[in-house]
A protein has these predicted regions:
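Glycan-processing catalytic domains of CAZymes
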Residues: 1-184
């Protein structure tokens, strides 16, 4: 998706929004994690989105603060080694997904240095040995989400002044501070 197309879509929002606005991105069927061409497009799309938001912010009429990645697998299960029939090669897929997260975050940070990035589900979903009160409610284990998140964290750590990557904590069974303390 071109920067101009994304900019035009974002510009359809009312000007003068005074509250902080976060742009939600749903990743759906970006391609096999080993497909460099497909993931170059994904990375370019994120970079173009960051550039479009930055340009609109510079007009003074918009207040985009960041990007929220809804990384829940609604259709494609891009974060699951079983989906790629690659359980025996899962470590190499984790390495590739780590690099994909890092590349995306680097592209976004180059275009929008003060962006606030959040993923709705953090790396906990890659821990198949998580507590029963998480696993017991049907939250599946996705081998590759943690690697994607870690790659993004690495890019942030290499960028002076970047905001930390946020774990959106979309965990409907965690309500109290004690619940989160036990989990994390």
């Amino acid at each position: 998706v071109s920067k101009q197309t994304l900019k035009d879509q974002l510009a359809e929002l009312p000007e003068g929004i005074t509250k902080e606005v976060y742009i939600e991105v749903v990743m759906d069927r970006p391609g096999d994690v080993r497909d460099d061409g497909a993931w170059t497009t994904v990375t370019s799309n994120f970079t173009n989105l960051a550039q479009a938001a930055t340009e609109l912010n510079s007009t003074g009429n918009y207040n985009f603060k960041g990007i929220v990645i809804d990384n829940e697998d609604y259709n494609s299960e891009i974060f699951d080694c079983e989906n790629y029939n690659a359980v025996s090669e899962c470590d190499s897929y984790k390495d590739k997904m780590y690099q994909r997260g890092k590349d995306i975050m680097r592209g976004v940070l180059e275009a929008w240095p003060d962006v606030i990035m959040m993923q709705m589900h953090g790396p906990y979903t890659s821990d198949c040995d998580r507590p029963d009160y998480i696993a017991g409610v049907g939250v599946p284990c996705f081998d590759l989400k943690g690697s994607f998140f870690a790659g993004m964290v690495q890019a942030v750590s290499e960028t002076p002044g970047a905001h930390p990557l946020l774990n959106g904590g979309q965990d409907y069974i965690l309500y109290s501070p004690n619940d989160f303390q036990k989990h994390y």
